[in-house]
Amino acid sequence: MEKHAFDPACCLGERLQTLSRAELTALAETICRILTERGTYHGGIRPDNISRAEDGTVGLGAPARTDTKDWTTEELEFMAPEVFWSGSLDASADVYSLGLLLYAGVMGGRLPFYPDDRAPQPEDMAAALRRRM
């Protein structure tokens, strides 16, 4: 298996919100190290595209698809605006997505502009996504 390859059996997904701040920090550091080692931009940093084994081993899934507009909701939720609007993939897109990942981890899975007083409904999530884009 390729070093830092994504392992679907260890998909981070909703487990993101169970990580401690120390674990979130270690996860972010590892993701940055992986991207630096690869020497490329990813554009697809999101919970369902990260694997984290019990021993802390981290893997990244496929990079962002910039040649399509047929994205999943999860892809859109963590996508940088410049990737959405122009397909522009650079370090700032990865910083943006990593920042959202950390925000969601600290905030119990909530993303910016979700309502504070209740669980977000689909229309709340769509409105929040529009504000972030």
Over which residues does each language-model region extend?
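Catalytic-loop of the protein kinase fold
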Residues: L35-R52
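Conserved short alpha-helix within the protein kinase catalytic core
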Residues: Q17-C32
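Conserved activation segment of eukaryotic-like protein kinases, specifically the C-terminal portion
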Residues: D70-E82
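Conserved end of the kinase activation segment
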Residues: V83-A91
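Conserved catalytic-loop aspartate of Hanks-type protein kinases
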Residues: D94
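Conserved short submotifs of the Hanks-type protein kinase catalytic core
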Residues: M1-C10
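Hydrophobic anchor on a C-lobe helix of Hanks-type protein kinase catalytic domains
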Residues: G105-V106
